[in-house]
């Protein structure tokens, strides 16, 4: 039969045939065919208009679309561009559809109402059926009769049946198409019936399937094969000019294959939690809310008349706990995870043979007291930064020494010297981690995946060099213990400027960088800068926040990188690709422009296996932060965070431009509520926007016009006004002001380094921030010892969003205070900062409305500043069990069956919620339970003290000293865990623990001697008391210490409290019968 060189394949069950191209000329498209622009919907070549130009459907974004797909979208779809959403306008040669303007100025009556070509209709319909599941084929089926000239014999069981005419054929190819690669399946019908046609997948090249009678078995493999073949053709394509000379076309510039190239694909993606895990969790939250409603309905309507005070107190505490749970729960509604593609980042910004286009990064390291923050730990952090897997010319490390200690200065000089050996060793053998202390101390097979024979020898030599380096640092620490009476002097005999910590000038020293110092292999090293800001009496230095703002200004003058990484001195880089992970979000062309910072989770070394004080804080970092990432992003936690410099400067997030003429979003269309008011409203909004532009935009655009030399009216006046406003905002440094306008960062290449150093000294002077917006709207925000929460909150109020990045290998690791006292002091400082924010004008309950802060994100910030106030009801609630056992009263009446079921459902909902959180958060039950225990321990100790200290500081002006958490050196595994340090924070939990234990003894004794009418109340009171004791068990274990011996001070407190409880015991007198006769009067005759 005459098939035109094509293969006919059939299916007996489906009663249809498929026509497949099988000739050699159609196997691979030629380079000339691929060079034309193709439709992104059906992959057909876009036709040319009458004037010879390609057909353009969307005038806003020029998304490649052929005319048939354009006409189908206007008639059957949303009438909008798939890429930008702009409503399609009628183009000459296309029919009019509902919604077109009557006065479109197109004189095209012959095409205004004509029908579409059926073959294109079926292709567009099939594509949109795949995108919009649920549409029936009847919406896109079109009728046309067969042509008598297209006679193809019917192939029946491999035999040609010439007795059947063309109007009875199952396969009909219309002669009007002229396209050999178009196939239409038609069910068997008679000559008088209309025929429904449908093509094969339009974008598929059918020749990739080869010969045979079977269609594809694995679509994915065929699709991959097709993409590889097309990409190979494009790579080998040569485009000739008029003289015949050709040049290789860069495949990255081919508009027909934007997503085929790996380097043009997104650098990251969101991974929502599986619905099988998150949907039951969401349903349970609603169930728990319903159970809470029933619970409070029962509690309020069933008071305890003989213990009304206990009942009322317990109900108030329970209501507060419910509100606190709601504030903590709903920000977890939409948790997500993220995945980065480092290979795509390299393909896009690190092309072979060209300089790296990755953005520069300035890294900030802050330290205060070298006695509490050992210099060896700080040196390891700096070494891990200098050896990071990032272009060396793009990295600058700034170390802020807020204590102006010569010990830190000398330790950095030794660190810079050792870095010349350590950095090339790390990059040569790709070792992890790149902090030498933790690399050499890790217990693992260091030869795994190492193939270089020289590795063992060089590792031994490097370990010996590092041990010598440690000896030098330890010698410095030993010498610094005895401070001379006249203070320290430098090598040239001049006094060290920082001998007086509270009164000294600013100091800047560049150890590495552009000074010509290279590593042992002759390669350039990243810049290393020592900074100690000026301090004078009478100036408020704002502690860590002020030091970080000084680093922002110094780095803006010296390097001005567009991105900043902030780490504490004890948080080293555990993953050398951590900065690249952050750049996958920051430098993403589509989603990166609105990201203000990328927050990494905190991971810790040196914590005991049981983590009795919940130092890892896994519940917060693996559950709460994932939930926030699905809303507007995680909060800033103070370290391990990559910032966008422009966001720290207080600028608003870029607004997404709404394309004009967008289609109405009302659904369904017959229920449109706009009523023609949409355009008017949009016009009013635009007028308001023109009347009230952003002040920062005015300033930036004014200075941009000046730099470009544009001659506009009153240019000089505008430039002076803008300059004055920027100086009022950023300070009197012209270099700093000019650097704020450079979105991509950088400093002029012809600037004298000496002049930059002089400018740097100026911007770290103690009076530079006066009458500026530093600490108010720019940089780290002042007003709280937890400046991290306040700084991230201000950015979110400006419309920015943040991102939570959790790479498989932890990006940063630090040391945590495993000692009980140090841990409680750390929690005290965090809670104190939250109280200060709550009592300030920046409280998220009333600040930031009308900005870009989302409601669920606001809930999370409210919870972060309200949680210290929970300590009051928590302390009272934990005291109630002992009071109930000592007095014989209870907070609930006699429990009925309904009440018993209600209480059981309440406890079950709490337990199941925790189990489901552990499931989608991927944490263990040990971590979850330790977090619950320390919530009680910290709530009745650190949070309580923070609440009173915050009230005294804000209301009475009584200042509290900021205590730096000590970072212990490696003197032995868990050596700090069992050291007992007395602090007043231990008093409240100790008291609660003892009175509840005594209460249990009293209750059991009372029950044994006098008996109970009902054992239910006794079990309820015992369960209540044991609940408190179990939660305080880690605290009790910490008090006992390593030797299981009670310290003397605790013994004294126990005796004092026991005396008080003994008096209560005598007052209660449980051995005396309350209802029966008095034994002293009755005597022994009563026993007869």
Curated annotation (Swiss-Prot):
<feature type="topological domain" description="Cytoplasmic">
    <location>
        <begin position="1"/>
        <end position="283"/>
    </location>
</feature>
<feature type="topological domain" description="Extracellular">
    <location>
        <begin position="305"/>
        <end position="306"/>
    </location>
</feature>
<feature type="binding site">
    <location>
        <position position="568"/>
    </location>
    <ligand>
        <name>Mn(2+)</name>
    </ligand>
</feature>
<dbReference type="InterPro" id="IPR027934">
    <property type="entry name" value="CES_Znf_RING"/>
</dbReference>
<keyword id="KW-0325">Glycoprotein</keyword>
<feature type="binding site">
    <location>
        <position position="544"/>
    </location>
    <ligand>
        <name>Mn(2+)</name>
    </ligand>
</feature>
<keyword id="KW-0328">Glycosyltransferase</keyword>
<dbReference type="GO" id="GO:0071555">
    <property type="term" value="P:cell wall organization"/>
</dbReference>
<feature type="active site">
    <location>
        <position position="788"/>
    </location>
</feature>
<feature type="active site">
    <location>
        <position position="402"/>
    </location>
</feature>
<dbReference type="GO" id="GO:0008270">
    <property type="term" value="F:zinc ion binding"/>
</dbReference>
<feature type="topological domain" description="Cytoplasmic">
    <location>
        <begin position="1005"/>
        <end position="1015"/>
    </location>
</feature>
<comment type="function">
    <text>Probable catalytic subunit of cellulose synthase terminal complexes ('rosettes'), required for beta-1,4-glucan microfibril crystallization, a major mechanism of the cell wall formation.</text>
</comment>
<feature type="binding site">
    <location>
        <position position="81"/>
    </location>
    <ligand>
        <name>Zn(2+) 2</name>
    </ligand>
</feature>
<dbReference type="InterPro" id="IPR005150">
    <property type="entry name" value="Cellulose_synth"/>
</dbReference>
<feature type="binding site">
    <location>
        <position position="366"/>
    </location>
    <ligand>
        <name>UDP-alpha-D-glucose</name>
    </ligand>
</feature>
<keyword id="KW-0862">Zinc</keyword>
<feature type="transmembrane region" description="Helical">
    <location>
        <begin position="872"/>
        <end position="892"/>
    </location>
</feature>
<feature type="topological domain" description="Cytoplasmic">
    <location>
        <begin position="919"/>
        <end position="933"/>
    </location>
</feature>
<keyword id="KW-0472">Membrane</keyword>
<feature type="binding site">
    <location>
        <position position="39"/>
    </location>
    <ligand>
        <name>Zn(2+) 1</name>
    </ligand>
</feature>
<keyword id="KW-1133">Transmembrane helix</keyword>
<feature type="binding site">
    <location>
        <position position="402"/>
    </location>
    <ligand>
        <name>UDP-alpha-D-glucose</name>
    </ligand>
</feature>
<feature type="zinc finger region" description="RING-type; degenerate">
    <location>
        <begin position="39"/>
        <end position="85"/>
    </location>
</feature>
<dbReference type="GO" id="GO:0005886">
    <property type="term" value="C:plasma membrane"/>
</dbReference>
<keyword id="KW-0007">Acetylation</keyword>
<protein>
    <recommendedName>
        <fullName>Probable cellulose synthase A catalytic subunit 9 [UDP-forming]</fullName>
        <ecNumber>2.4.1.12</ecNumber>
    </recommendedName>
</protein>
<feature type="transmembrane region" description="Helical">
    <location>
        <begin position="1016"/>
        <end position="1036"/>
    </location>
</feature>
<dbReference type="Pfam" id="PF03552">
    <property type="entry name" value="Cellulose_synt"/>
</dbReference>
<feature type="binding site">
    <location>
        <position position="66"/>
    </location>
    <ligand>
        <name>Zn(2+) 1</name>
    </ligand>
</feature>
<feature type="transmembrane region" description="Helical">
    <location>
        <begin position="307"/>
        <end position="327"/>
    </location>
</feature>
<keyword id="KW-0808">Transferase</keyword>
<feature type="binding site">
    <location>
        <position position="58"/>
    </location>
    <ligand>
        <name>Zn(2+) 2</name>
    </ligand>
</feature>
<feature type="binding site">
    <location>
        <position position="69"/>
    </location>
    <ligand>
        <name>Zn(2+) 1</name>
    </ligand>
</feature>
<feature type="binding site">
    <location>
        <position position="373"/>
    </location>
    <ligand>
        <name>UDP-alpha-D-glucose</name>
    </ligand>
</feature>
<feature type="topological domain" description="Cytoplasmic">
    <location>
        <begin position="328"/>
        <end position="871"/>
    </location>
</feature>
<feature type="transmembrane region" description="Helical">
    <location>
        <begin position="1046"/>
        <end position="1066"/>
    </location>
</feature>
<keyword id="KW-0464">Manganese</keyword>
<dbReference type="GO" id="GO:0030244">
    <property type="term" value="P:cellulose biosynthetic process"/>
</dbReference>
<feature type="transmembrane region" description="Helical">
    <location>
        <begin position="284"/>
        <end position="304"/>
    </location>
</feature>
<feature type="topological domain" description="Extracellular">
    <location>
        <begin position="955"/>
        <end position="983"/>
    </location>
</feature>
<feature type="binding site">
    <location>
        <position position="42"/>
    </location>
    <ligand>
        <name>Zn(2+) 1</name>
    </ligand>
</feature>
């Amino acid at each position: 039969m005459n098939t035109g060189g094509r293969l006919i394949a059939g299916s007996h069950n489906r009663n249809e045939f498929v026509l497949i191209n099988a000739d050699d000329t159609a196997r691979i498209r030629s380079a000339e065919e691929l060079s034309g622009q193709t439709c992104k919907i059906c992959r057909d070549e876009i036709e040319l208009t009458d004037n010879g130009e390609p057909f353009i459907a969307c005038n806003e974004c020029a998304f490649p679309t052929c005319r048939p797909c354009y006409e189908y979208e206007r008639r059957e779809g949303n009438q909008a561009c798939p890429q930008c959403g702009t409503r399609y306008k009628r183009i000459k040669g296309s029919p009019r559809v509902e919604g077109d303007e009557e006065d479109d100025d197109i004189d095209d009556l012959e095409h205004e109402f004509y029908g579409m070509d059926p073959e294109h209709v079926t292709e567009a319909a099939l594509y949109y059926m795949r995108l919009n599941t649920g549409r029936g084929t009847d919406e896109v089926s079109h009728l046309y009769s067969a042509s008598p000239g297209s006679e193809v014999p019917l192939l029946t069981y491999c035999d040609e049946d010439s007795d059947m005419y063309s109007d009875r054929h199952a396969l009909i190819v219309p002669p009007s198409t002229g396209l050999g690669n178009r196939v239409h399946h038609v069910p068997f019908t008679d000559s008088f019936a209309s025929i429904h046609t449908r093509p094969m997948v339009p974008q598929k090249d059918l020749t990739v399937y080869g010969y045979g009678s079977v269609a594809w078995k694995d679509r994915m493999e065929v699709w991959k094969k097709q993409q590889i073949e097309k990409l190979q053709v494009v790579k080998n394509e040569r485009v000739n000019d008029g003289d015949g000379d050709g040049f290789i076309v860069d495949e990255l510039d081919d508009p027909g294959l934007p997503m085929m190239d790996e380097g043009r694909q997104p650098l990251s993606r969101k991974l929502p939690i599986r619905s099988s895990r998150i949907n039951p969790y969401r349903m349970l939250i609603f169930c728990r809310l319903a159970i809470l409603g029933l619970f409070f309905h029962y509690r309020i309507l069933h008071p305890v008349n003989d213990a009304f005070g206990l009942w009322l107190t317990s109900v108030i505490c329970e209501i507060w706990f419910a509100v606190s749970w709601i504030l903590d729960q709903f920000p977890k509604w939409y948790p997500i995870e993220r995945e980065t593609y480092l290979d795509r980042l390299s393909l896009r910004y690190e092309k072979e043979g060209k300089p790296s286009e990755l953005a520069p990064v300035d890294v900030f390291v802050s330290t205060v007291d070298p006695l509490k923050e050992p210099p060896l730990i700080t040196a390891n952090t700096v070494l891990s930064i200098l050896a990071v897997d990032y272009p060396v010319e793009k990295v600058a490390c700034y170390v802020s020494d807020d204590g102006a200690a010569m010990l830190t200065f000398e330790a950095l000089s030794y660190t810079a010297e050792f870095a010349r050996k350590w950095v090339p060793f790390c990059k040569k053998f790709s070792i992890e981690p790149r902090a030498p202390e933790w690399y050499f101390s890790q217990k693992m097979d260091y030869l795994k995946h190492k193939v270089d024979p020289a590795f063992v020898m060089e590792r031994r030599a490097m370990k010996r060099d590092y041990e010598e380096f440690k000896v030098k640092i330890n010698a410095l620490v030993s010498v610094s213990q005895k401070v001379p009476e006249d203070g320290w002097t430098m090598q040239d005999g001049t006094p060290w400027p920082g001998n007086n910590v509270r009164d000294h000038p600013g100091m800047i020293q560049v150890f590495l960088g552009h000074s010509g110092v290279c590593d042992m292999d002759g390669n350039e090293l990243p810049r290393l800068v020592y900074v100690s800001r000026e301090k004078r009496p009478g100036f408020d230095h704002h502690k860590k926040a002020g030091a970080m703002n000084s680093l922002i200004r110094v780095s803006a003058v010296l390097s001005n990188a567009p991105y900043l990484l902030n780490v504490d001195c004890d948080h080293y880089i555990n993953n050398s690709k951590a900065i690249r992970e952050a750049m996958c979000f920051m430098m993403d062309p589509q989603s990166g422009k609105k990201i203000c910072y990328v927050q990494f989770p905190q991971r810790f070394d040196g914590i005991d296996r049981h983590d009795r004080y919940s130092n890892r804080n896994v519940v917060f970092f693996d559950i709460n932060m994932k939930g926030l990432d699905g809303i507007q992003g995680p909060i800033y936690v103070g370290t391990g965070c990559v910032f966008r410099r422009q966001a720290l400067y207080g600028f608003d997030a870029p607004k997404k431009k709404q394309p004009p003429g967008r289609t109405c979003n009302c659904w369904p269309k017959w229920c449109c509520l706009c009523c023609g008011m949409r355009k008017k409203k949009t016009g009013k909004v635009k007028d308001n926007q023109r009347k009230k532009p952003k002040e920062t935009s005015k300033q930036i655009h004014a200075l941009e016009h000046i730099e470009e030399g544009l001659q506009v009216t009153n240019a000089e006046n505008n430039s002076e006004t803008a300059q004055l406003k920027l100086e009022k905002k950023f300070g009197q440094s012209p270099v700093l002001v000019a650097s704020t306008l450079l979105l991509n960062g950088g400093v002029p290449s012809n600037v004298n380094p000496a002049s930059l150093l002089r400018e740097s000294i100026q911007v770290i002077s103690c009076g530079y921030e006066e009458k500026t917006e530093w600490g108010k709207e720019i940089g780290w925000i002042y007003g709280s010892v937890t400046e991290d929460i306040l700084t991230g909150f201000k950015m979110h109020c400006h419309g920015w969003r943040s991102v939570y990045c959790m790479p498989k290998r932890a990006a940063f690791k630090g040391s945590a205070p495993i000692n009980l006292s140090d841990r409680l002091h750390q929690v005290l400082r965090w809670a104190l900062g939250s109280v200060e924010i709550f009592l300030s004008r920046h409280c998220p309950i009333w600040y930031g409305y009308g900005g870009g802060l989302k409601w669920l994100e606001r809930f999370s910030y409210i919870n972060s500043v309200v949680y210290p106030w929970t300590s009051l009801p928590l302390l009272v609630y934990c005291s109630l069990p002992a009071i109930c056992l000592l007095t014989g009263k209870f907070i609930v009446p006699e429990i009925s069956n309904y009440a018993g079921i209600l209480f059981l459902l309440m406890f079950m909902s709490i337990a199941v919620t925790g189990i489901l959180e552990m499931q989608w958060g991927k944490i263990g039950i040990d971590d979850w339970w330790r977090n619950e225990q320390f919530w009680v321990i910290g709530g009745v100790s650190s949070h309580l003290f923070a609440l009173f200290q915050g009230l005294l500081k804000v209301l009475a002006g009584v200042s509290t000293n900021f205590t730096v958490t000590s970072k212990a050196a490696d003197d032995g595994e868990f050596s700090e865990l069992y050291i007992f340090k007395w602090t007043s924070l231990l008093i409240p939990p100790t008291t609660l623990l003892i009175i509840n234990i005594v209460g249990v003894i009293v209750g059991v004794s009372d029950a044994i001697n006098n008996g109970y009418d009902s054992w239910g109340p006794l079990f309820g009171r015992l369960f209540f008391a044991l609940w408190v004791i179990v939660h305080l068990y880690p605290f009790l274990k910490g008090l006992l210490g390593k030797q299981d011996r009670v310290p003397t001070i605790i013994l004294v407190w126990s005796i004092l409290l026991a005396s008080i409880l003994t008096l209560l015991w005598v007052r209660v007198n449980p051995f005396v019968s309350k209802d029966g006769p008095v034994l002293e009067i009755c005597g022994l005759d009563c026993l007869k």
